[in-house]
Amino acid sequence: MLAVRNNILLLLFCLVVLLVFAQSSFLPPCEPVNETVAVEKEGCPKCLVFQTTICSGHCLTKEPVYKSPFSTVYQHVCTYRDVRYETVRLPDCPPGVDPHITYPVALSCDCSLCTMDTSDCTIESLQPDYCMSQREDFPVY
């Protein structure tokens, strides 16, 4: 009876390892990727659209079958590990409005808890190149 139980446990372990390997081999890893983003500022009539590097990809997460009101589930997301900050100037801002926007550029990424300081932690966010005002594409040299 003990041998049967051990064989079942071994089989379950092998299935879990196989599923993790299969899942991670078909989904893109968490890494820096080039993306078109838009930045805008209240008071400036145009948003600026340009290419930068963001973090994107798959992180292994666990969702418990039994959800207890006494325990908290922490999901890991693909987010910034190391960043560099760059500044762009928005076009046509009126006098008295600072036309500069500073944004993070991903140098490396990591699967960790979502930090609202550097990431959009919402379930369904707007696309990164969404503009509420008139678009102006930043020239690519």
Curated annotation (Swiss-Prot):
Family: Belongs to the glycoprotein hormones subunit beta family.
Main localisation: secreted
Taxonomic lineage: Eukaryota, Metazoa, Chordata, Craniata, Vertebrata
PROSITE patterns named in the record: GLYCO_HORMONE_BETA_1, GLYCO_HORMONE_BETA_2
Signal peptide bounds: 1-24
Keywords attached to this entry: Disulfide bond, Glycoprotein, Hormone, Secreted, Signal
Keyword Secreted recorded: yes
Name of the molecule in the record: Gonadotropin subunit beta-2
Function: Involved in gametogenesis and steroidogenesis.
Location in the cell: Secreted
Residue runs in coiled coils: none
SMART domains, A to Z: GHB (SM00068)
Gene Ontology biological process terms, A to Z: G protein-coupled receptor signaling pathway
Prodomain positions: 140-141
Residues bearing attached sugar chains per UniProt: N34
